[in-house]
């Protein structure tokens, strides 16, 4: 006899009159007038089991059941009595009349009820095994599996092969901090866990494996946020002999296919926007296009005004002044004084010193129709031009950002999203509840690192410049555009990629632009430079964050809800208590001595 014939959640009226054997966990036990009802749960859902006192032995076992007991049930599938069906369940039209009931393993009293939606994250992560039994988490894990399965099916159908790359590699401290692994055999030397298989997948292209993929763990020792983990999973892909547009077309098709087949979601065609346009209109390289608000550029206009807050920002090197028009925000029933005050505090998180605003009571009345502490500091012509450029109407409110470009983009860009997602924004039609995908292209090749006083790569130093931009690396690196692209969905970067450098002389030129000496480049990347000299093909690829992808599909607030055993924001595993101290003997074998850190008095 089989230990199990069916999953609990898949027992339907199609099995009516048949005897089934089920295994699962007691979700709830109810005693109704001498008859005991048990909801038994497994990964597919619930089934209602009925224990009748006529079967004394079975009934005696049922009387002693408690939540989370692991049980085996054999019984007859029959229709539920009229009026007791549950349309929310696949098994909601049937019940199982219990013939045999066996406790496979009892359970101690759980520390929480699995249907408690108000648990702290600490409690959930400490008791992660129980948390993973919750139906919502089971759905998340099953969807994650479906996403990886559909990804593999698509890539296999398109000729990609799954090749594993090393977990123990060389540390290249140009990006985020590495997780280091000390070598016992090579005293004083360290491996690094991969932040990405970037260089290995490029080497595979040189080796002739023209379509590679891997669903792979990556590691970064960085400060954590809601959408970051020290170890994360990415869908890593590289291909030879495809142009940038062909790469984007292929992997847009893959993502649309995965959403449709794994989650029943039809994504629209991905529009394309340049990095410059995204920053100009939205202050972000991953704009949330569901929010119907855009910046109005005012930098040139504000150069001539006497109001120093605006004119100083407009005339400083790298300064910017923008307005954000919020339709209806200044009208009766619009943004309250408290909300405006809260937004003024909110932008300070991003380095803004404050948030100037103008309420438009009567756009046609000039100065008299405007309400704001700053109106007195602006001349009539400038006020009229602000109204004209923003297209402001009666009842609108205008918010202003004036500072260094990065601060303005970050602060007003975040404000735009916050207002759009607010109750006011949704009520006022400023938020379009839809799937809003996007390709952002034509990123700058370099950005200037003020602290290090040198140029650094925006994506990574292996990204190819756009055709005709190679010489700009020497003469005007700030104007050099990369063949890089990011895949954005609902304001979240799902993945990014680029066409890679496939010629050694261009790669060496990039290293020089980044002030990496020839000796240093040979020491850190000599294996790549050597490989590029052996007829390396044109190639490019993309890496898509699996955790973020599933988080978006499920609507989860954090990627911790779509990872089976995640770390906290302090990079700890509360279930296993990792990281933890190790024995002195282990440290000696690894040639490591811990410094005694003095505790502050």
UniProtKB/Swiss-Prot annotation:
It is found in: Cytoplasm. GO terms for molecular function: aspartate-tRNA ligase activity; aspartate-tRNA(Asn) ligase activity; ATP binding; nucleic acid binding. Homodimer. It is an enzyme of class 6 (ligase). Residues 198-201 are annotated as: Aspartate. The gene is aspS. It comes from the Bacteria. One of its GO terms (cellular component) is cytoplasm. Pfam families: GAD, tRNA-synt_2, tRNA_anti-codon. Aspartyl-tRNA synthetase with relaxed tRNA specificity since it is able to aspartylate not only its cognate tRNA(Asp) but also tRNA(Asn). Reaction proceeds in two steps: L-aspartate is first activated by ATP to form Asp-AMP and then transferred to the acceptor end of tRNA(Asp/Asn). This is Aspartate--tRNA(Asp/Asn) ligase. The keyword Cytoplasm applies. L-aspartate binds at residues 174, 220, 459, 500. Keywords: Aminoacyl-tRNA synthetase, ATP-binding, Cytoplasm, Ligase, Nucleotide-binding, Protein biosynthesis. Belongs to the class-II aminoacyl-tRNA synthetase family. Type 1 subfamily. The record marks 32, 83 as: Important for tRNA non-discrimination. It comes from Variovorax paradoxus (strain S110). Its main location: cytoplasm. It catalyses: tRNA(Asx) + L-aspartate + ATP = L-aspartyl-tRNA(Asx) + AMP + diphosphate. GO terms for biological process: aspartyl-tRNA aminoacylation. Its EC number is 6.1.1.23. InterPro entries: Aa-tRNA-synt_II (IPR004364), aa-tRNA-synth_II (IPR006195), aa-tRNA-synth_II/BPL/LPL (IPR045864), Asp-tRNA-ligase_1 (IPR004524), Asp-tRNA-ligase_1_N (IPR047089), Asp/Asn-tRNA-synth_IIb (IPR002312), AspRS_core (IPR047090), GAD-like_sf (IPR004115). The keyword ATP-binding applies.
């Amino acid at each position: 006899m089989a230990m199990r014939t069916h999953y609990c959640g898949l027992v339907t009226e199609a099995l009516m009159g048949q005897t089934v054997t089920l295994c699962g966990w007691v979700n709830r036990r109810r005693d109704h007038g001498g008859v005991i009802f048990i909801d038994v749960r497994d990964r597919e859902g619930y089934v209602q089991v009925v224990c009748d006192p006529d079967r004394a032995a079975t009934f005696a076992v049922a009387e002693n059941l408690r939540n989370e007991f692991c049980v085996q049930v054999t019984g007859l599938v029959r229709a539920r009595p009229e009026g007791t069906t549950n349309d929310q369940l696949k098994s909601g039209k049937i019940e199982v009349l219990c013939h045999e009931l066996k406790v496979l393993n009892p359970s101690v009293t759980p520390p929480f009820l699995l249907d408690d939606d108000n648990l702290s994250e600490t409690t959930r992560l400490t008791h992660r095994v129980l948390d993973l039994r919750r139906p919502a988490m089971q759905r998340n894990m099953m969807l994650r599996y479906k996403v990886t399965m559909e990804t593999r099916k698509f890539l296999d159908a398109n000729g990609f092969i799954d090749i594993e790359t090393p977990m123990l590699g060389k540390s290249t401290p140009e990006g985020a901090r590495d997780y280091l692994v000390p070598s016992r055999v090579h005293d004083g030397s360290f491996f690094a866990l991969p932040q990405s298989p970037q260089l290995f997948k490029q080497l595979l292209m040189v080796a002739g494996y023209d379509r590679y993929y891997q669903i792979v763990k990556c590691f970064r020792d960085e400060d954590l946020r809601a959408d970051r983990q020290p170890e994360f999973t990415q869908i890593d892909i590289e291909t030879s002999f495809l142009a940038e547009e062909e790469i984007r077309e292929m992997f847009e098709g893959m993502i649309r296919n995965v959403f449709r087949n794994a989650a029943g979601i039809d994504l629209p065609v991905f529009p394309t926007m340049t990095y410059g346009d995204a920053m100009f209109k939205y202050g972000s390289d991953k704009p949330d296009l569901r929010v119907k608000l855009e910046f109005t550029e005012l930098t040139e206009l504000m150069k001539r005004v006497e109001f120093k807050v605006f004119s100083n920002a407009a005339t400083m090197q790298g300064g910017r002044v923008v307005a954000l028009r919020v339709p209806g925000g200044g009208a009766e029933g619009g943004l309250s004084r408290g909300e405006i005050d809260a937004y003024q505090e909110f932008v300070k998180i991003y380095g803004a010193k404050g948030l100037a605003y103008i309420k438009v009571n009567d756009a046609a009345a000039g100065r008299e129709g405007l309400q704001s502490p700053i109106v007195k500091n602006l001349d009539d012509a400038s006020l009229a031009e602000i109204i004209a450029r923003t297209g402001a109407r009666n009842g609108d409110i205008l918010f202003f950002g004036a500072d260094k470009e990065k601060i303005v983009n970050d602060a007003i860009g975040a404000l735009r999203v916050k207002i759009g997602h607010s109750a006011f924004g949704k009520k006022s039609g400023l938020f379009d509840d839809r799937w809003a995908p996007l390709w952002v292209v034509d990123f700058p090749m370099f950005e200037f690192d003020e602290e290090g006083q040198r140029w650094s790569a925006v994506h990574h130093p292996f990204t190819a410049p756009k055709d005709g931009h190679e010489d700009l690396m020497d003469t005007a690196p700030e104007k050099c555009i990369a063949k890089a692209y990011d895949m954005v969905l609902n304001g979240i970067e799902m993945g990014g990629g680029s066409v890679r450098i496939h010629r050694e002389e261009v790669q060496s030129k990039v290293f020089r632009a980044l002030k990496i000496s020839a000796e240093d480049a040979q020491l850190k990347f000599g294996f790549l430079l050597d490989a590029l000299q052996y007829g390396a093909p044109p190639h490019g690829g993309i890496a898509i964050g699996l955790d973020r992808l599933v988080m978006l599909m499920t609507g989860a607030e954090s990627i911790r809800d779509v990872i089976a055993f995640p770390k906290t924001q302090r990079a700890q595993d509360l279930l296993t208590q990792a990281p933890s101290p190790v024995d002195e003997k282990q440290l000696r074998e690894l040639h490591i001595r811990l410094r005694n850190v003095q505790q502050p008095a």
